[in-house]
From Swiss-Prot:
<dbReference type="InterPro" id="IPR001048">
    <property type="entry name" value="Asp/Glu/Uridylate_kinase"/>
</dbReference>
<keyword id="KW-0963">Cytoplasm</keyword>
<dbReference type="GO" id="GO:0005524">
    <property type="term" value="F:ATP binding"/>
</dbReference>
<keyword id="KW-0641">Proline biosynthesis</keyword>
<protein>
    <recommendedName>
        <fullName>Glutamate 5-kinase</fullName>
        <ecNumber>2.7.2.11</ecNumber>
    </recommendedName>
</protein>
<feature type="binding site">
    <location>
        <begin position="220"/>
        <end position="226"/>
    </location>
    <ligand>
        <name>ATP</name>
    </ligand>
</feature>
<dbReference type="InterPro" id="IPR036393">
    <property type="entry name" value="AceGlu_kinase-like_sf"/>
</dbReference>
<keyword id="KW-0028">Amino-acid biosynthesis</keyword>
<feature type="binding site">
    <location>
        <position position="15"/>
    </location>
    <ligand>
        <name>ATP</name>
    </ligand>
</feature>
<keyword id="KW-0418">Kinase</keyword>
<dbReference type="InterPro" id="IPR011529">
    <property type="entry name" value="Glu_5kinase"/>
</dbReference>
<dbReference type="InterPro" id="IPR005715">
    <property type="entry name" value="Glu_5kinase/COase_Synthase"/>
</dbReference>
<keyword id="KW-0067">ATP-binding</keyword>
<comment type="pathway">
    <text>Amino-acid biosynthesis; L-proline biosynthesis; L-glutamate 5-semialdehyde from L-glutamate: step 1/2.</text>
</comment>
<keyword id="KW-0547">Nucleotide-binding</keyword>
<dbReference type="InterPro" id="IPR019797">
    <property type="entry name" value="Glutamate_5-kinase_CS"/>
</dbReference>
<comment type="function">
    <text>Catalyzes the transfer of a phosphate group to glutamate to form L-glutamate 5-phosphate.</text>
</comment>
Length: 273
């Protein structure tokens, strides 16, 4: 087994999905958010630079507006996300403050990173915030993003957004928290003998084909989007860990080299024992 080496990792992007922030009841998982804030603050205190890509605006909005289902109308979806984004950032700010960590909000659309001038501006914003010891919290700007063929400004989901942010900021590692343990050789909800892949060095067509499927009730990203994100990370010569977000403290164990989740790193860059 390849040994994971994260001693030289300084800049980390952590992506947390809606399914990790919102309980099956639709209520906000306050305990999970508190644990995440503790872990990120602990990493910051150790000299790490952390960027958080957080889904959840829709889930927060549904909770606040006491709506049981995600609206099908685009304008209503944008309205619910807009309400939820404010609530989510307010909660993040309060909980991170408990650990004496300051946070900021960056809302992105795809066109911001496509055009060189706006890309340079957002890159400078990230660097300035990081230099001030602030944790940038990133989400897609759902209230204004569109997915029209002639002017598509959506990333698709926050799995891909996190890979884009990792590329923009030249992060050493992307940690993707999800409601699954990692990438399996086949669907673990169907096959009892499914095996977790500890390390993926090459994303094959077989892996892509087996990664189909939708996201959670409150989110949009499925396994395919996570594989596509890993491909983007590979293109930027980076590395990614896909792991279960049930216990955010496991992030610390991963950074110690423990083999949790699936580690995506190209084989030519892997050091052997």
């Amino acid at each position: 087994m390849m040994k994971r080496q994260f001693e030289d990792v300084t800049r980390i992007v952590i992506k947390i999905g809606t399914s990790s922030l919102v309980l099956p009841t639709g209520k906000i998982n306050l305990e999970k958010i508190d644990q995440l804030a503790f872990v990120i603050s602990s990493l910051m205190n150790k000299g790490k630079e952390v960027i958080l890509v957080s889904s959840g605006a829709m889930g927060f909005g549904l909770d606040i507006l006491k709506m049981e289902k995600r609206p099908t109308n685009l304008a209503k979806q944008q309205a619910v996300s807009s309400v939820g984004q404010v609530a989510m950032m307010s909660l993040y700010s309060q909980i991170f403050a408990h650990y004496q960590t300051n946070v900021s909000q960056i809302l992105l659309t795809r066109d911001v990173v496509v055009f060189p001038e706006s890309l340079a501006n957002v890159t400078n914003a990230f660097e300035s915030l990081i230099s001030l010891g602030i944790v940038p919290i990133v989400n897609e700007n759902d209230a204004v993003s569109v997915d029209e063929m002639d002017h598509a400004t959506k990333f698709g989901d926050n799995d891909r957004l996190s890979a884009v942010v990792a590329g923009i900021t030249k992060a050493d590692l992307l940690i993707m928290l999800s409601d699954i343990d990692g990438l399996f050789d086949k669907n673990p909800t169907i096959y009892e003998d499914a095996q977790l892949r500890s390390h993926v060095a090459v994303i094959t067509q077989e892996i892509i084909a087996s990664a189909g499927g939708a996201g959670s009730k409150f989110g949009t990203g499925g396994m395919l989007s996570k594989i596509q994100s890993a491909q983007m990370v590979f293109e930027n010569k980076g590395q990614m860990v896909l792991m279960n977000g049930a216990n955010p403290r496991d992030i610390l164990r991963v950074l110690e080299g423990q083999p949790l989740g699936t580690w995506f790193k190209q084989i030519e860059e892997v050091r052997h024992d």
